[in-house]
Amino acid sequence: MRRGLLQQVRRVVIKVGSRVLTVEGGGLDYDAISRLCDEMAGLRQQGIEVILVSSGAVAAGRDALRSADTTLTIPQKQAAAAVGQPLLMQAYQQACTRHGLVTAQILLTAEDLANRNRFLNARTTLEALLTAGALPVINENDSVAVAEIKFGDNDNLSALVTSLAEADLLLILTDIEGLYSANPASDPDAELIPLVRSITREIERMAGGSGSNVGTGGMATKVTAAKKAARFGVPTILAPGKQPGVITAAVSGQEIGTLFLPATDGLNRRKHWIAYTLRPAGKVLVDAGAQKALVEKGTSLLPSGITGVEGRFERGRCVRICGPDGTEIARGLADYSSSEIQLIAGHKSAEIEQLLGYRYGDDVVHRDNLVLMTHS
């Protein structure tokens, strides 16, 4: 199955975690970086374009600053990232030079991709770099990003970059073999799961929520990233980054790590951007009838089915649409502001102009701007 699925891969996003890139003491593992660059250069020689999403800046900076703190404050992390990012890029460039590869640094915040124009500009830049034969190395701009504009972790960032770059495969390299049925560190009966056809609640339970003091992501964030990529129609492989030949083996379809299959109901580019790149500014609460119409019939959200609104937001912002029990069922771009929705909630569309004195349309969220999240 793997070879058949991956034989058409021509562009891959590779995410490398901090534990893969650092030695036990916390500094950069230059041998590991050199090996990974050798393998990425090998893909380039096969005509496969590579985009690298790399962690490790904070860890490199902390080591350079000789910080003994296991837990850093946000300002300390930002300072460590500022010191570590050029060290990380220098390591990649030195390792790529012997292959004639030029590396290109791209630092992003969630705010960059939430703005549609900047999202498209970032895509254009990526295309230009790949056309020129460069290796884009992407990281979150930790030195300036605060909670409101952070991706959260590079696993999430790698899934968004997969959509941004319209890649054919997401390869996440971590410090364990793949997804296990239980935590292999504490359960001797834990078994490696080689194939995940669909990311169910049971799969999410297996992923747990563990992380480390080196990176910010645990297995749960990797499964979430695989889910986001799957809805874009892209498979994800979770594989052991310290294993020599891992990139070559994974991309060529060998049995390594865990393969997450793409979803059968993949989203188009714009809807994927709405669902996973935009940060919801509020909630719109709906009744059971509206929920059924959205989920079963794929309709737009009308004011008559709205029971309430939470948060303050302007027209055009992304909102969560939640059912009677509070569960998120969809996300979409609101055609009315929160204050306007409060006034028209529960009323028929024909009454909007009478209530507001104007109307933008019959829908609060049009179906073209609405994405069901029931599979997410």
Swiss-Prot record:
One of its GO terms (molecular function) is RNA binding. SMART domains: PUA. One of its GO terms (biological process) is L-proline biosynthetic process. It is an enzyme of class 2 (transferase). InterPro entries: AceGlu_kinase-like_sf (IPR036393), Asp/Glu/Uridylate_kinase (IPR001048), G5K_ProB (IPR041739), Glu/AcGlu_kinase (IPR001057), Glu_5kinase (IPR011529), Glu_5kinase/COase_Synthase (IPR005715), Glutamate_5-kinase_CS (IPR019797), PUA (IPR002478). It is found in: Cytoplasm. Keywords: Amino-acid biosynthesis, ATP-binding, Cytoplasm, Kinase, Nucleotide-binding, Proline biosynthesis, Transferase. Residues 281-359 form the PUA domain. CDD domains: AAK_G5K_ProB, PUA_G5K. It holds the Pfam family PUA. It catalyses: L-glutamate + ATP = L-glutamyl 5-phosphate + ADP. The keyword Transmembrane helix does not apply. GO terms for cellular component: cytosol. Its EC number is 2.7.2.11. The keyword Kinase applies. ATP binds at residues 15, 174-175, 216-222. PROSITE patterns: GLUTAMATE_5_KINASE (PS00902), PUA (PS50890). Substrate binds at residues 55, 142, 154. Pathway: Amino-acid biosynthesis; L-proline biosynthesis; L-glutamate 5-semialdehyde from L-glutamate: step 1/2. Belongs to the glutamate 5-kinase family. Catalyzes the transfer of a phosphate group to glutamate to form L-glutamate 5-phosphate. PANTHER family: GLUTAMATE 5-KINASE, ISOPENTENYL PHOSPHATE KINASE. This is Glutamate 5-kinase.
